[in-house]
């Protein structure tokens, strides 16, 4: 099968690397990335979109290859000067090159441009070869409910503070996507789902990346109705995360940290879930009812391995949905609904 239009739901590092492999595997296909913006934050008066920037820098050749985020050849003069002034926060590193992106973004947002247009303008410099769409133009921020170490009372902190400052050490009790109820899909997102030959869930965090994207009203329904097959790639390999903090997030929703656990959490599209097919790592076993499961090498250890993973994902997308999606307006029993 020749794929004309492929849509990918992506978070940061894992999603960016998967997209790079996909671009290599199918250079002639139209690729659209719907990127999580729940990690976005305003610091020092600047609007920062970590996942969008990681995808843009990775595909544009400007990423720091060692860290997997931020700019290559970065310097930290402004960060040092801010620290010398005692300007908080000091725990979030903004490099000098990276600051230029945030300055341009913030200036355009302040001038009234929506995030989708701002992202397109920024991407025009980087030429990523992939259409980059934020999940929404509205402001949505993930907050984490934790216990105050001093009082034991519950408090909510921004996801970036929980992850970057505290390294996800305070046990998360809940994740709250502030603003998501009032959000709408960004222009082009629902249309991309409607025209897709395949929709791929990158090996991104199921809770705070993929789950946040599909929390935007209308996007889960758009995914259910897409004419192409929906294939997910497990972010869990041999019972552990490859990168990130999914192992700290999944238990909050009562999801087992395993390829099977995440697959069941996503569920079968034929039963109101997300998946037609699910890729797990070679040697991992997963029983996901009504979902075709394939075991292939998942580690994106080189450009060649990543492109091979992308091709395996597309192989699983051939043949149309495993079972027809439910009729419009139907839904399965609430007790069986995956809780993103």
Annotate each PLM feature:
Residues 27-29, 226-230, 275:
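A short helix->loop->beta-strand "cap" motif at the edges of active sites that frequently abuts
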Residues 243-327, 335-340:
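C-terminal functional extensions of proteins
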